[in-house]
Amino acid sequence: MKIGVIGSGSFGTALGSLLADKGYEVTLWCRNDSQIESINRNHINNKHLPDFTLPEKLTASKDLRTVVQGKDMIVSSPPSHALTEILREIKEYLPEKVPIVSASKGIENGTLRLVSEIFESELPGKYHSYLSYLSGPSFAKEIIQKVPTIVSIASRSETTARKVQEIFSFLYFRTYWTPDVIGVEVGGSLKNVIALAAGVSDGLGFGQNTRAALITRGLNEITKIGLKLGADPMTFLGPSGMGDLILTCCGEQSRNRTVGFRLGKGETLEQILSGMNEVAEGIKTTQSAYELSQKLGIEMAITNEVYKMLYEDKNPKEVVKDLMKRDLKREGVLV
């Protein structure tokens, strides 16, 4: 089986490494010449995962057509803001009747489209039943280290979901399939916004009580917007919901939590981003999530405060203070 992976960041590389470990022939799309040479000659992604040796069956190419054309499965893992442009480029030579697996997370700025909506808008209908979406608590480094990991595979087609589930499942990587595409996407996108808030809390020196509060109320916000969009609420208790939320809010490898932590310590967003090698999706997603909540008429207090901190220069200390001063409410999933 030949597999093309679009995106040579840490997560795309980790998924490619997993599939190559299973014996599949994997080609990774990469824009950087030195990175391509390092992967092909030394089996190391020198830009994103310099401390790990990659399988010999994983190679890299700068030619997107070479990566995609004639493959038996496509894995798409670019930053969500780059997805539309990439799909418009590849749809002329994208193979038909093969699984297309998206691992991108986010809500497109301006259009407010989920990743599935981008795929279904940009690709002809003949591809739609072959689309699936992978999400769950899975740091790239730990996948490459073969740490036991679980994720969700969502697809509107059970046949596609089960096929992708079988291809990805391995000794250290277990997958659960679900038809709830919207729920998996909403959980995977909005957890990054909540992780920014959790990082701010840690950076300000608050304790685990505060982090637990943010995770709990963050899940409430994710569930509210998910239900409004038609998701199954049970999805948010699974790997792509609570599982990913806990990992991203608590794990030291979390880019979004790290950005929040540094903001809490007093750095500016510009200072933080200037030294980052990977994309923190939560920054762009916060803007889209805020606009989507306004459009749908849903109160999302944590998201609103993170938005004010990122885009209106609100002091992180004031963010936490204002969250604690909100009107008292009855406990419940949707309040």
UniProtKB/Swiss-Prot annotation:
Sn-glycerol 3-phosphate binds at residues 105, 136, 138, 191, 244, 254-256. GO terms for molecular function: glycerol-3-phosphate dehydrogenase [NAD(P)+] activity; NAD binding. This is Glycerol-3-phosphate dehydrogenase [NAD(P)+]. Pathway: Membrane lipid metabolism; glycerophospholipid metabolism. PROSITE patterns: NAD_G3PDH. Catalyzes the reduction of the glycolytic intermediate dihydroxyacetone phosphate (DHAP) to sn-glycerol 3-phosphate (G3P), the key precursor for phospholipid synthesis. Pfam families: NAD_Gly3P_dh_C (PF07479), NAD_Gly3P_dh_N (PF01210). Belongs to the NAD-dependent glycerol-3-phosphate dehydrogenase family. The active site is at 191 (proton acceptor). GO terms for biological process: carbohydrate metabolic process; glycerol-3-phosphate biosynthetic process; glycerol-3-phosphate catabolic process; glycerophospholipid metabolic process; phospholipid biosynthetic process. It is an enzyme of class 1 (oxidoreductase). It is found in: Cytoplasm. Its EC number is 1.1.1.94. HAMAP family: NAD_Glyc3P_dehydrog. NADPH binds at residues 10-11, 31, 105, 140, 255, 279, 281. Keywords: Cytoplasm, Lipid biosynthesis, Lipid metabolism, NAD, NADP, Nucleotide-binding, Oxidoreductase, Phospholipid biosynthesis, Phospholipid metabolism. It catalyses: sn-glycerol 3-phosphate + NAD(+) = dihydroxyacetone phosphate + NADH + H(+); sn-glycerol 3-phosphate + NADP(+) = dihydroxyacetone phosphate + NADPH + H(+).
